[in-house]
């Protein structure tokens, strides 16, 4: 196995998920940044020929930059393990846990982390009476999410029975299970985790979007539609608690190397944990690189560090 600047690094991106386009943008950025440290960086499309392409490239380490299933849910990670290839990021189990919001919330609850109240609606169970029961239990301000999508794909808000039924129907286009949560009013906050000697919480980021909008797919990936405030202007106790919960969520899922933990933080009280992303976006508008930069870790150094960790595990 080659080490140092002579290591062959394969950046795998793209695929067929709803987030494939974002993945390609992230992948190009990662590959360009890695080229500052490593002489041999190849970019490989995640398609039916990915195995053949990896065998031809003979990488010393793989850097998956894949968003959504089947690249982020443990499937590709398991494939790499069958090939005996070291890779950046969380392993099979943690990737699968994090991608499924229902499973992840079960693990977070077991760890005693602060969560929004929720209900799970599965395909074939979305009867009017069942949805009425969800409204009665959670109240009229709801967030509806496909269980296994990222980048806010398929997410809708609902206030009435009709809106809830429409939102659940739309979410079923992406998944067989839908997570319905009470909508908490507060700031949209994210805390990035980077493992060095230990899992370290980077500076907390607040995401601000124009009034009347929220951090949906368009606002995540369109220049100028969102503002990243670093460090997030939270009271000291909330700020510290957000970082603490982020570390605990990373550990609860068994994540490795890096993750991004999303929250809504109300005006007072606990930050509410929403989800953990095991392969955060690495685009020019993404949160994770901004948090790392604020911690004194420029993008080129960040991605090189992640590759070096994977190489160290394999040696």
Regions found by a protein language model. Name each.
Residues 108-109, 135-153, 176-185, 189:
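ATP-grasp fold ATP-binding core
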Residues 23, 116-120, 142-167, 188-190:
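Glycine-rich phosphate-binding loop of ATP-grasp-fold ATP-dependent ligases
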């Amino acid at each position: 196995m080659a080490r140092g600047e002579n290591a062959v690094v394969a950046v795998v991106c793209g695929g067929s998920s709803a987030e494939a386009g974002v993945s390609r943008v992230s992948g190009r950025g990662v590959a360009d940044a890695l080229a500052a440290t490593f002489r041999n960086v190849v970019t490989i499309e995640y398609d039916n020929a990915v195995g053949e392409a990896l065998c031809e490239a003979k990488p010393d380490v793989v850097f998956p930059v894949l968003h959504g299933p089947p690249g982020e849910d443990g499937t590709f990670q398991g494939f790499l393990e069958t090939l005996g290839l070291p890779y950046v990021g969380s392993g099979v189990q943690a990737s699968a846990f994090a991608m499924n919001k229902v499973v992840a919330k079960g693990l977070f609850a077991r760890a005693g982390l602060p969560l929004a109240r929720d209900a799970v609606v599965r395909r074939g169970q979305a009867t009017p009476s069942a949805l009425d029961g969800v409204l009665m239990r959670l109240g009229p301000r709801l967030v509806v999410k496909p269980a296994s999508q990222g980048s806010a794909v398929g997410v809708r808000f609902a206030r009435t029975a009709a809106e809830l039924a429409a939102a659940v129907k739309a979410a079923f286009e992406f998944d067989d299970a839908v997570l319905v949560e009470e909508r908490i009013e507060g700031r949209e906050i994210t805390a990035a985790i980077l493992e060095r000697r230990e899992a370290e919480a980077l500076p907390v980021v607040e995401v601000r979007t124009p009034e009347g909008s929220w951090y949906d797919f368009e606002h995540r990936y369109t220049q100028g539609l969102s503002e990243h405030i670093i460090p997030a202007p939270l009271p000291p106790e909330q700020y510290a608690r957000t970082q603490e919960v982020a570390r605990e969520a990373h550990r609860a899922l068994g994540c490795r190397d890096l993750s991004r933990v999303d929250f809504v933080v109300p005006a007072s009280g606990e930050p509410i944990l929403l989800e953990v992303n095991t392969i955060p976006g690495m685009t020019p508008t993404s949160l994770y690189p901004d948090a790392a930069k604020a911690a004194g870790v420029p993008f080129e150094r960040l991605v090189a560090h992640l590759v070096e960790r994977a190489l160290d595990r394999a040696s």
